[in-house]
């Protein structure tokens, strides 16, 4: 059983991706990343501003970038044009960290601040441009099977459908659509946003998702380091369960012990 997780030609061992936002302290963020066992860490490039630049710079310095792969993301970008600019900035930051061959980007185009649903047209437009530039594009999308296929067709290296509204902890509101995306996709499906507890991470892995991205569920819980470890175990369990193959669902009962050679029949 091949346990490696591949995006484009890059192999990763962990199928859990961890975000770096909303932690209460640098130490908590660093310890959570370590406890998660992740290989990929995502950082919101657009949200590096005067208020948090010290935190982000310090976090970047704390992380061993020879061990972790940076996934720059364009969170906070409201248009395709803005997302394209931020993607290029993220690529430069990756190079400065020594990852000269890192052209990954988690593409987010979100025009409204209240519900934070991604713009499908803006995402498609930005993705097409970035793919032509040579980026490994991982678009964050609503759980729309048609859009997921269109993004795959233009050359995106993965798709990232949301489970529910980002940061909401509402869980798996769109599980049926995600299942369709998983069944139809020839690129990795990474479920992102809305997952609140480890059992939900396990469930999406059980239906065949390739990986899960978690941020708020870890960063904002009572004990982030413990939750990061729980998510690590949950994702691994879900992957193993899917690989093992569940039993068929039946409409009737069936005993687990044999009916022959029972006491009284011997």
UniProtKB/Swiss-Prot annotation:
GO terms for biological process: thiamine diphosphate biosynthetic process. Pathway: Cofactor biosynthesis; thiamine diphosphate biosynthesis. GO terms for molecular function: thiazole synthase activity. InterPro entries: Aldolase_TIM (IPR013785), Thiazole_synthase_ThiG (IPR033983), ThiG (IPR008867). Homotetramer. Forms heterodimers with either ThiH or ThiS. Catalyzes the rearrangement of 1-deoxy-D-xylulose 5-phosphate (DXP) to produce the thiazole phosphate moiety of thiamine. Sulfur is provided by the thiocarboxylate moiety of the carrier protein ThiS. In vitro, sulfur can be provided by H(2)S. This is Thiazole synthase.
